[in-house]
Curated annotation (Swiss-Prot):
The keyword Protein biosynthesis is assigned to this record: no
Protein name: tRNA pseudouridine synthase A
Keyword Isomerase: yes
Keywords: Isomerase, tRNA processing
Coiled-coil residues: none
Record field: catalytic activity: uridine(38/39/40) in tRNA = pseudouridine(38/39/40) in tRNA
Molecular function, one GO term: tRNA pseudouridine(38-40) synthase activity
Binding residue positions for substrate: 111
Length: 245
C-alpha cells in the first residue's frame, strides 16, 4: 500500500486535540473522515505530535496508507476540498517509503509559543496567543531559558498524567525574543513530555515579570518536583511549527 506524508496546518480552537476521542471533534478524526469522503477508505492518520485541545499547528506531519497510488497534488487538493469547512489545511502531500513513520522517524520537533504583552484585549489573536498585561522582560526570559538546555529530568515541567516512560529529555533550543508587543518562545527537541512546553513558558513568565531569577528557574528544574513549576501557559498560544526528519 502506498504511503503518503502530509504536512498539515490547523487552528486547534474547536478541537479536543489531535487524537481521536469518542463523541468529540478532533483533528485526527476530521482528517480520517475527509479521507473516507475522498477515496472511500477507512484509514489511520498517524501524526508526529499529539497536540492537546486548543493547540495549533503550522507544520504538523502525518502519514497515511492508501490502497492505490494517487498523484501527490491530487491527494493535497482532494483533501483541501473534503476538509471544508474545518480550519485544517493539507499544505503538501508526498509519497514516501513504507519505512517512513511520522512519529518515530522524527528527529526533532519544533514548537512556537506566542505571548502578546499588552493591556488591551486581543481582537484578532484571542484564541491564538496568551495575553499578558504586565510588562515582561524578554531578554531576562531568554537568558534564564538557557539554563534549561541539555539533558535533564524535566519532572517539574511534566503533567501528572504524562505517560512517558522517563522524565529525561534533551532540550536543544529554547529562545525568547520580542517584536513590538509580541514575545515569541521557540523550542526544539527530539520529543517533549506532556505539557512540557506550556509549563516552561509559564515558568519563564515568572522570570519576565521579575518574580523569579534565572537561579530560581534552574532550582525549580533541579527539584524535579511538579509543585515547583510556575503556572501552565494556556493552550491557545502554542503551535507545533515543524517536524524534522
Amino acid at each position: 500500500m502506498p504511503r503518503y506524508k502530509l504536512t498539515i496546518e490547523y487552528d486547534g480552537t474547536p478541537y479536543a486535540g489531535w487524537q481521536i476521542q469518542a463523541d468529540q471533534q478532533t483533528v485526527q478524526g476530521a482528517l480520517a473522515q475527509a479521507f473516507k469522503r475522498f477515496c472511500g477508505e477507512d484509514v489511520h492518520v498517524a501524526g508526529a505530535g499529539r497536540t492537546d485541545a486548543g493547540v495549533h499547528a503550522t507544520g504538523q506531519v502525518a502519514h497515511v496508507d492508501l490502497s492505490r497510488h494517487w498523484r501527490s497534488d491530487t491527494v493535497r487538493d482532494a483533501m483541501t476540498a473534503q476538509l471544508r469547512p474545518h480550519p485544517i489545511a493539507v499544505l503538501s502531500a508526498e509519497e514516501v517509503p513504507d519505512s517512513f513513520d511520522a512519529r518515530f522517524s522524527a528527529t526533532k520537533r519544533h514548537y512556537l509559543y506566542r505571548i502578546i504583552n499588552r493591556r488591551p484585549d486581543l481582537a484578532l489573536d484571542r484564541d491564538r496567543a496568551w495575553r499578558i498585561p504586565q510588562k515582561l522582560d524578554a531578554q531576562a526570559m531568554h537568558e534564564a531559558a538557557q539554563r534549561l538546555l541539555g539533558k535533564h529530568d524535566f519532572s517539574t515541567f511534566r503533567a501528572a498524567e504524562c505517560q512517558a516512560a522517563s522524565p529525561l529529555k534533551t532540550l536543544d533550543q529554547l529562545d525568547v525574543s520580542r517584536s513590538g508587543d509580541e514575545i515569541r518562545v521557540i523550542t526544539s527537541a527530539r520529543s517533549f513530555l506532556h505539557h512540557q512546553v506550556r509549563s516552561m513558558v509559564g515558568s519563564l513568565m515568572r522570570v519576565g515579570e521579575g518574580r523569579w531569577s534565572a537561579d530560581d528557574l534552574e532550582a525549580a528544574l533541579k527539584a524535579a518536583d511538579r509543585t515547583r513549576c510556575g503556572p501552565m501557559a494556556p493552550a491557545a498560544g502554542l503551535y507545533l511549527a515543524a517536524v524534522s526528519y
